[in-house]
A protein has these predicted regions:
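Extended catalytic cores and adjacent scaffolds of nucleotide/polyanion-binding enzymes
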Residues: 72
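Long, polar low-complexity intrinsically disordered regions
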Residues: 1-29, 34-67, 77-158
Length: 158
């Protein structure tokens, strides 16, 4: 019961609690991304130091103007990888497109690779071209790409 407190503070990262293993959430929302960034650009920025540490990246695109909507979701394989990711990206300025935007890292409302895939597969993504779909990796840290497929199967034409 109760008012549930401030929803936004629930989404803030408290790194000492993460390090202590008291907050084991793994899905992060990367906010204030310049609109010209593509998912491939974002992937290469993240993979520089965090390759094999995450198993899903999704930068939603506004289908009308073909630009990103300003935020992305990253699911870390383990909460142990969260502090380093946070330290690198939180309050960091973006290097390309000399943007004034400053990155902010929060927790995502939907947590976990499977929950994210289930959530996104309810949208029209299954029928979009690959650059518009989430990038999914094996959860074993190998960095192996997995096919994005909606669990519902989507259209199974021949």
């Amino acid at each position: 019961g109760g008012g549930g407190g401030d929803r936004r503070s629930d989404m803030r990262l408290d790194i000492p609690r993460v390090i202590a293993g008291e907050d084991t959430r793994t899905t992060l929302m990367v906010r204030h991304i310049p609109n010209k960034y593509t998912q491939r650009m974002l992937l290469s920025v993240i993979e520089q130091n965090h390759s094999g540490q995450f198993d899903l990246l999704y930068l939603p695109i506004d289908f009308k103007n073909r630009c990103n909507v300003g935020y992305a979701f990253v699911n870390m394989i383990s909460f142990h990888h969260v502090p380093a990711f946070y330290r690198e990206f939180h309050r960091r300025k973006w290097e390309r497109f000399n943007s004034d935007k400053v990155c902010e890292i929060n927790y995502g409302r939907i947590q976990g690779k499977r929950a994210l895939i289930a959530h996104f597969s309810n949208s029209s993504l299954a029928n979009e071209d690959e650059s518009m779909q989430p990038v999914v990796f094996a959860s074993d840290g190998s960095g192996t790409r997995e096919r994005w497929h909606s669990p519902g199967g989507g259209r199974r034409g021949f």
